[in-house]
Amino acid sequence: MRAQSCSLFLEMKCREEFVLSKGPGVEKMFDAIAGRYDLMNKVMTMGQDQRWRRFVVAKAGDPGAGQVLDLATGTGDIAALMHRSYPRAQVTGGDFSRNMLEEAKKRFAGQGIDWQVCDANKLPFADNTFEAVTFGYLLRNVDDASSVLAEVYRVLKPGGRCVCLDTTPPAKNIIYPFVQFYFRYGIPLLGRMIAADEAAYAYLSGSTMEFHSAEVLADLFRGAGFVDVHYKKFMLGTIGIHWGVK
């Protein structure tokens, strides 16, 4: 009973912080967990997170000497992998969390990646700038996913690719109770032990369960104008990677 009460309290606390607008609360949250973000990702995903990032970069494709943007870049893993995979590309990593960007700059110093503070709701780039735009764990953390997708569509060149990695609510099948238990209790507990921030990871769990299904997210891509939209699920259906073409 005590564990259930604590979990419910954390969910209510997180909803109070984010109900009006996710922006300020999410920015503050990511600033707070920046130092332990990478370790927590590895533990929480059982080491599968790098595999997913490689899949994202492969789906983005080789931009040649063109420009690519990794939004919600966090501590820079996808941007750095893009740079290593396609060394001729001009890579920009953007995030609205300054602390996350500071971690990215320290981790990948001297690699020629352009790190920029930017808001996905209003990108500081001209129309038709990028050959590809990637992002991980962005759309679940914004107020209006359709608006952000429209903004990504705007800055992509015609024929450019958008690739999105995010959590998705698992299907309600025979293993659903076990997945739900891990999200509701396991992840917040890991957050408390590793990142010293149980509330932030209770938010992750709650927002995942309330986020769009992979099918609905694919429809949002199409609604923003993207064509040839596909997706692939990972980790018992709790991770989805979507991609589409402008």
From Swiss-Prot:
<dbReference type="GO" id="GO:0043770">
    <property type="term" value="F:demethylmenaquinone methyltransferase activity"/>
</dbReference>
<dbReference type="Pfam" id="PF01209">
    <property type="entry name" value="Ubie_methyltran"/>
</dbReference>
<dbReference type="InterPro" id="IPR029063">
    <property type="entry name" value="SAM-dependent_MTases_sf"/>
</dbReference>
<dbReference type="GO" id="GO:0009234">
    <property type="term" value="P:menaquinone biosynthetic process"/>
</dbReference>
<dbReference type="InterPro" id="IPR004033">
    <property type="entry name" value="UbiE/COQ5_MeTrFase"/>
</dbReference>
<comment type="function">
    <text>Methyltransferase required for the conversion of demethylmenaquinol (DMKH2) to menaquinol (MKH2) and the conversion of 2-polyprenyl-6-methoxy-1,4-benzoquinol (DDMQH2) to 2-polyprenyl-3-methyl-6-methoxy-1,4-benzoquinol (DMQH2).</text>
</comment>
<comment type="pathway">
    <text>Quinol/quinone metabolism; menaquinone biosynthesis; menaquinol from 1,4-dihydroxy-2-naphthoate: step 2/2.</text>
</comment>
<keyword id="KW-0949">S-adenosyl-L-methionine</keyword>
<feature type="binding site">
    <location>
        <position position="75"/>
    </location>
    <ligand>
        <name>S-adenosyl-L-methionine</name>
    </ligand>
</feature>
<dbReference type="GO" id="GO:0032259">
    <property type="term" value="P:methylation"/>
</dbReference>
<keyword id="KW-0808">Transferase</keyword>
<keyword id="KW-0489">Methyltransferase</keyword>
<protein>
    <recommendedName>
        <fullName>Ubiquinone/menaquinone biosynthesis C-methyltransferase UbiE</fullName>
        <ecNumber>2.1.1.163</ecNumber>
        <ecNumber>2.1.1.201</ecNumber>
    </recommendedName>
</protein>
<comment type="pathway">
    <text>Cofactor biosynthesis; ubiquinone biosynthesis.</text>
</comment>
<keyword id="KW-0831">Ubiquinone biosynthesis</keyword>
<keyword id="KW-0474">Menaquinone biosynthesis</keyword>
<feature type="binding site">
    <location>
        <begin position="119"/>
        <end position="120"/>
    </location>
    <ligand>
        <name>S-adenosyl-L-methionine</name>
    </ligand>
</feature>
<feature type="binding site">
    <location>
        <position position="95"/>
    </location>
    <ligand>
        <name>S-adenosyl-L-methionine</name>
    </ligand>
</feature>
<comment type="similarity">
    <text>Belongs to the class I-like SAM-binding methyltransferase superfamily. MenG/UbiE family.</text>
</comment>
<dbReference type="GO" id="GO:0008425">
    <property type="term" value="F:2-methoxy-6-polyprenyl-1,4-benzoquinol methyltransferase activity"/>
</dbReference>
